[in-house]
Amino acid sequence: MSNDNKRLPIGKDIATRRRVARKARHFRIRKNLRGTAEIPRLVVHRTSRHMHVQVIDDTIGHTLAAASSIEPEVRAMEGDKKARGAKVGELIAERAKAKGIETVKFDRGGYKYHGRVAALADAAREGGLKF
């Protein structure tokens, strides 16, 4: 009798292992990273198609500013996902500065600081945010 028809237990397929490993990395990062009203947390979430970023005050649990690649001005852009990530970084820097936020703690969400995540962070820095 072959085991081909049996379902694999959770964590045995590659996608699940990667997702669980990213979550574990994010928990390790979050253990020591808390956003305050003075220095909020800049959180990145990445999907296969889009990027979302929020500036969060963890003491009260409120989102102070947000930007996403789903927004019309980013969707209308030509270029690759890295360029769209950079545009999202510019948007979040602009919106955070409008709310009086100059300095943030960067929470990469367990993702590698590479590619779209790095492009977003660099664009936010160029937009005037300090990490």
UniProtKB/Swiss-Prot annotation:
GO terms for biological process: translation. Keywords: Ribonucleoprotein, Ribosomal protein, RNA-binding, rRNA-binding. InterPro entries: Ribosomal_uL18_bac-type, Ribosomal_uL18_bac/euk. Gene3D superfamilies: 3.30.420.100. It holds the Pfam family Ribosomal_L18p. GO terms for molecular function: 5S rRNA binding; structural constituent of ribosome. The keyword Ribosomal protein applies. It comes from the Bacteria. One of its GO terms (cellular component) is cytosolic large ribosomal subunit. PANTHER family: 39S RIBOSOMAL PROTEIN L18, MITOCHONDRIAL, LARGE RIBOSOMAL SUBUNIT PROTEIN UL18M. This is one of the proteins that bind and probably mediate the attachment of the 5S RNA into the large ribosomal subunit, where it forms part of the central protuberance. Belongs to the universal ribosomal protein uL18 family. Part of the 50S ribosomal subunit; part of the 5S rRNA/L5/L18/L25 subcomplex. Contacts the 5S and 23S rRNAs. This is Large ribosomal subunit protein uL18. It comes from Corynebacterium kroppenstedtii (strain DSM 44385 / JCM 11950 / CIP 105744 / CCUG 35717).
